[in-house]
Amino acid sequence: MKTIYLHHPITTDEWTDINKVMALGFFDGVHLGHQAVIKQAKQIAGQKGLQTAVLTFDPHPSVVLSNIRKQVKYLTPLEDKAEKMAKLGVDIMYVVRFTTQFSELSPQAFVDNYLVALHVEHVVAGFDYSYGKKGEGKMTDLAKYADGRFEVTIVDKQTAASDKISSTNIRRAITEGELEEANQLLGYPYTTKGTVIHGDKRGRTIGFPTANIRVNEDYLIPKLGVYAVKFRVNGETHLGMASIGYNITFKDDQALSIEVYILDFHREIYGEEAEIKWYQFFRPELKFNGVEGLIAQLEKDEQDTRAFFAKLED
């Protein structure tokens, strides 16, 4: 897959004479709803003998449009989004730098300067996709703005267990620790990536050595607590239990940490890139009166983790 970065206003150098089918969306999470849009675009592209493209933005529009300075947390930072698009068979991913100037485009100007200029023959997007200044352009109006220059397919609302499949619902589920719900809407286990760093090394003194992970700051982090996870490092996947918290049993002013006790694992992996797939929330972070209580709880957490994955893989 080719990734092309566009800056408004795009120049003729950035245009392309390759006709294509284009899926529109921000696509954070590349969840089942997004996948339905992209699969529809791919199907049409296959029928027409065209390439499949997506048009997305960076950063999230709310970063630019908000009156207060804010940092948006993503389900899939741009690199992850590109990786998932490639796996879905997308040929080209256009990434438009979202700026104040770009946000001022009228719906007609967006259509003319981006969709038509990029030689789009057919546009596919979800029913609630909007475009142009303040999102004034709706999918029901797109054929009017196209004026016969391209075709339009609108993908209906996608649901799972009666929930609308949306990035908003997935973010809510993750921040509430509802990983099973989030993963059902995503169509895959929620995943964060980071680097293994040195920690306080307390875990090894109580029989539970952990890998401390410095997670990319762009990721949305689940709520505090202990989780069943799968941990991937050096091309191998292992079962584990992850703790997100402040180590309050030992000290009250600790920084937030993400630590993973990797089951049946005994290697040094400092400095390695790692991936955490989040499966199940077990319990909130607890403060224990002594180390003995903590060890007893960790032993139970390990039993729960093994039981969870044994049941999952039955």
UniProtKB/Swiss-Prot annotation:
Pfam families: FAD_syn (PF06574), Flavokinase (PF01687). Its EC number is 2.7.1.26, 2.7.7.2. It comes from the Bacteria. One of its GO terms (biological process) is riboflavin metabolic process. PANTHER family: RIBOFLAVIN KINASE, RIBOFLAVIN KINASE/FMN ADENYLYLTRANSFERASE. NCBIfam families: cyt_tran_rel, PRK05627.1-3, PRK05627.1-5, ribF. This is Bifunctional riboflavin kinase/FMN adenylyltransferase. It comes from Listeria monocytogenes serovar 1/2a (strain ATCC BAA-679 / EGD-e).
